[in-house]
């Protein structure tokens, strides 16, 4: 969840407070927001951007905010016309871009798919959350989007660029492998909106023809065969090792003669000589941190 003030160009992160409800879980996003009500009342920012933490997107939030302010809408929801799962929320829009219908869990998805990014004034958010909590209402989708779409002006900002949800191991693997496609990389890592990462200038070393269509981080030593893989910093592939369709985290070592297919290793995993590890794109094999196999 983010808080953004266009006038002072600040972006600060708002984390949920303590968890509540049965089994230590919130009953909905509204209850989670209620837990940070004191923070919302104390901050100076005029506008709030609500986002989920499982979405991969390089979105020009400054454009979204300016568009929201210019429109005069009470809330702007970012959505896409690109297809997605039936379990998502879908909007129907009128000719002006106003949201006139909100549907969820539909058998045949129609309209614009909500990306769960919302822009609204801080004081309106406080008012909505306070009113919902007073009536034992905890769902942002049902009790705010659906119930108040007629009384308030909810508007859509349509984004048809790259947007991917990562909420399972399978989706993490699938979305990571999409980065091997140049068109996806160009869209996600747009030069006009750079993504900054920790610098490390140690070079990687390769045998001739050892790497095919792979993303290799700094400090890797590739002497075996690597194809359609993502290797994090400091990964070592020894001679005779054969790795394909894998995601290997920092410090992973694959010894001589080992064969890996569809594997995700956490940091500092060692795969011993001659081992064979086989996963699948629909069920990748995950090796825990620091394990030696």
Where are the regions a protein language model picked out?
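Unchanged
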Residues: 22-178, 287
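Pocket-edge structural micro-motifs
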Residues: 6-8, 12, 103-104, 158, ...
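Short capping/connector residues at structural and topological boundaries
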Residues: 15-19, 96-98, 282, 292
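Active-site metal-binding loops of divalent metal-dependent hydrolases
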Residues: 8, 53-55, 235
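N-terminal hydrophobic targeting/anchoring segments and the immediately downstream early-domain regions
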Residues: 1-23, 38
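Left-handed beta-helix
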Residues: 123, 131-293
């Amino acid at each position: 969840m983010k808080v953004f003030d266009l006038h002072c160009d600040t972006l600060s992160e708002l984390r949920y407070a303590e968890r509540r409800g049965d089994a230590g879980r919130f009953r909905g996003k509204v209850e989670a927001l209620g837990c940070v009500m004191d923070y919302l009342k104390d901050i100076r920012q005029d506008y709030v951007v609500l986002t989920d933490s499982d979405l991969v997107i390089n979105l020009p939030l400054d454009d979204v905010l300016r568009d929201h302010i210019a429109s005069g809408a009470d809330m702007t929801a970012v959505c896409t016309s690109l297809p997605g799962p039936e379990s998502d929320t879908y909007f129907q829009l009128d000719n002006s871009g106003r949201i006139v219908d909100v549907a969820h869990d539909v058998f045949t998805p129609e309209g614009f798919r909500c990306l769960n990014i919302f822009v609204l004034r801080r004081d309106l958010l406080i008012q909505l959350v306070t009113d919902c909590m007073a009536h034992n209402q905890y769902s942002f989708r049902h009790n705010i989007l659906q119930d108040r779409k007629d009384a308030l002006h909810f508007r859509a900002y349509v984004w048809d660029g790259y947007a991917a949800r990562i909420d399972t191991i399978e989706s993490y693997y699938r979305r990571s492998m999409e980065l091997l496609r140049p068109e996806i990389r160009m869209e996600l890592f747009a030069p006009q909106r750079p993504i900054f990462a920790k610098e490390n200038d140690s070079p990687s070393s390769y045998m001739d023809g050892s790497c095919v269509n792979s993303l290799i981080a700094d400090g890797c030593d590739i002497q075996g065969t690597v194809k359609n893989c993502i290797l994090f910093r400091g990964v070592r592939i020894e001679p005779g090792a054969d790795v394909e369709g894998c995601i290997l985290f920092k410090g992973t070592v694959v010894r001589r003669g080992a064969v890996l297919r569809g594997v995700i290793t956490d940091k500092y995993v060692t795969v011993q000589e001659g081992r064979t590890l086989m996963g699948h794109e629909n069920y990748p094999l995950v090796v825990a941190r620091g394990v030696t196999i």
